[in-house]
Amino acid sequence: MSCRGMVCVHGVSKRFGRTQAVERAELCVERGEFVALLGPSGCGKTTLLRLIAGFEEPDEGELCVAETRVNGVAPERRRVGMVFQDYALFPHLTVAENVGFGVRRGDRAERVRELLALVGLEGYGGRYPHELSGGQQQRVALARALAPAPAVVLLDEPWSNIDPLLRASMRDELAGILRSLGATVLLVTHDREEAFSLADRIAVMRDGRIVQAASPEELYAAPADRWTAGFVGAGNFLRGRIDGELVETLLGRFPVVGRNGASEVDVLIRPELLELRPDPQGSAEVVGREFRGHDVFYRVRLADGTEVVSQRPSTELVPSGSRVVVAPHREPVRVFS
């Protein structure tokens, strides 16, 4: 195996008893890249992070950090910094002592001052974790992870315990700090919005496997399979029949991309591609709606009883019970067997 990235995972598997937590995982993270491991609970993403950190050892496969094979290497010698979900600060140590833990004594005081300034906590060095807010504790955890100048920063759902009203701002602030340092980051999350807003690439995991690793734009527009298509964003799946370069559906004919050879397929149409035009003679009916501020998600029943979802700006409110014409954008669509 060639260890050319800052993190390389090659054929890594991990089993706990009869449970296959990670199965033949393949991933390479380049220097300065921000990659998110995205998946539902129990998919193996945290186990994979712990394997990279050295808290677990793989049953098979190879792991590299900073172009060095780290199988069997102790966590403290892997050149990784980790921010845990619960931050794992030492309650009996001050902020400064937490940040300086593991830093050589001769460099400690200056390094602590530098990092507390970086995370906006100058003057907090003498406080204890219980005297800080959740957001401040998170900054301390990040400073501690950065203190030994790691090659890679690992984040295990670090914003899950933050108040939802503060989560986005804290997320953007800490991600901004990491980007300003040119850090290589691997984030574990089950939050699609978080992954899409922060990551350069997203590795989607399911049942212990990485099913697709791609940029957010590619992942949304060209998902590898039907499950991934539905997991990374809302989607309507209509039955369709391939006819040459087109596919015939209840909503008309569409150009096809990514054909798979089948004649009967499921056709992915994202909600934002379905316009609604109020029309008393329309063949479809709005049967429900969900207001989400900037957008409204409409549940629409077609003439044959099939229901689809349309995402429209909240400036175009359509009352429930309205008859409408569903007007899809005639963009190329993805199809799945």
Residues covered by each model-derived region:
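ABC ATPase nucleotide-binding domain
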Residues: 8, 28, 64, 325-327
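ATPase nucleotide-binding modules
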Residues: 224-287, 299-317
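Conserved ABC transporter NBD signature motif
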Residues: 61-69
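Helix-to-loop junction immediately C-terminal to a conserved catalytic motif
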Residues: 53
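ABC ATPase nucleotide-binding domains
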Residues: 34, 78-81, 85, 89-227
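Conserved coupling/switch loops of ABC nucleotide-binding domains, chiefly the family-specific signature
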Residues: 59-62, 207
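The feature captures the beta-strand-to-loop junction immediately N-terminal to the Walker
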Residues: 38-40
